[in-house]
Amino acid sequence: MKHIKNFDLLMSDFKGVYEWFNGLSTLRPDDIKPDSTLHIIVDMINGFVKEGALSSCEVFSINNSIAQFTKFCESKNIQTIALADEHTNDSTEFSTYPVHCLKGTSESALTDEIKNADENITVFGKNSTNGYLEPAVAEFIKNSDKNTFIITGDCTDMCVIQFALTLKADFNRRNVPCRVIVPYDLTATCSLPNHEPELAEMMALYIMHTNGIEIVKNIL
C-alpha cells in the first residue's frame, strides 16, 4: 500500500508551489494577437456571483474585473464567448452539489455587468463542470481560426481547470499548437463545506501549469 509523504516533505513541496505562485508575472496586452485569440468566460452567471446556493463573495469579487477585461477584448476585436451552467431538475450533478442554475432561471444568466461589457457574447449552456464536453462548444472551437485562448471565471479548481486541461489535451491529440492562458486575478473559487478555497485554487493553478497551461497574474 502506498503511503502519503511525510509532513516535512509535503511542506517542502508546498513551499515550492507557494514560491511559484508568488512569482507569477503579468502578461502585456501587446503579447496577444487579437485575430487569433478567443476569450472564454466560465460560469460568470448570477447563480455563482449574486444569488443561489453556490453564489459566493469570492466569485463576486472578480465580476467587475472580468467585465472590464471583456470590454477591453471588445475594444481590441478579441471575440468573447461564455459558458453557463443550465441544469435540469434531474441533473445528476445535484448528487454532488446543491441545486443550482436551473435552465431558464435568472441563476443561469450572465451577470448584467458582463452582458453590458459586450453585447455580442455567444453563450453556450452546459450540464456539467466540464464545458468542453458540450458538443457545440468543442465544435465551435475546432472550427474557429483561434489558437490562443484566455480563460476567465469560476471555479478555478472545478470548471476552469477541467475546461483548460481538456481544451489543451484536445489540441495536443490533434497535433495542433495552441496557447491556453489563465489569469489568476480573473479567476476565483468558492467556499463550500470540506473545501479549502485558497489551497484548492493554488493547487489547481499549479496543476494547470504542469500540464502546459500558461498561468499569469493578470493581463494589463
Write out the residue ranges for each language-model feature:
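Active-site-adjacent betaalpha module
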Residues: 1-38, 99-220
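A short alpha/beta connector and helix-capping loop motif
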Residues: 35, 39, 52-85
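Active-site metal-binding loops of divalent metal-dependent hydrolases
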Residues: 43-44, 85-86, 154, 186
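Solvent-exposed loop/turn segments at secondary-structure junctions
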Residues: 47, 87-90, 156-157
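Short coil/turn segments at secondary-structure boundaries
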Residues: 53-60, 97-102, 128
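A basic- and aromatic-enriched beta-loop-alpha substructure that forms the phosphate/nucleotide-
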Residues: 82-103
